[in-house]
Amino acid sequence: MTPDEEHSIICHLDKLLEERSMSLVDLSHHVGISVANLSILKNNRARAVRFTTLTALCRVLDCTPGDIFTYKDEGKDS
């Protein structure tokens, strides 16, 4: 397996938005990021995240980066 296949970062925006009764469009307005880019992030297709984006998400969602993202090492036995 390549390093990209052995692990992944999982985005939990869906769960956080649901818990806050907030839509992706609402979040987009609050953080100043397009719905398209938030959708890429939400669907685990983002290759990188800027610290300014992460800071804005944490501020608006009142959470930490660890609430938004978790690391899953798919190469290890669970």
Regions found by a protein language model. Name each.
Residues 1-22:
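A short, Lys/Arg-rich alpha-helix, primarily the initiator
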Residues 2-3, 20, 40, 69-78:
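Short, charged recognition helix plus adjacent turn
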Residues 14, 25, 55:
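Residues within the helices of the helix-turn-helix
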Residues 17, 28, 58:
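The alpha-helix within a helix-turn-helix
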Residues 21-40:
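Short alpha-helical DNA-recognition segment
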Residues 37-40, 53, 67:
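Residue-level recognition of specific faces of alpha-helices
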Residues 45-56:
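Short, basic-rich loop-to-helix N-cap that marks the start of a DNA-contacting helix
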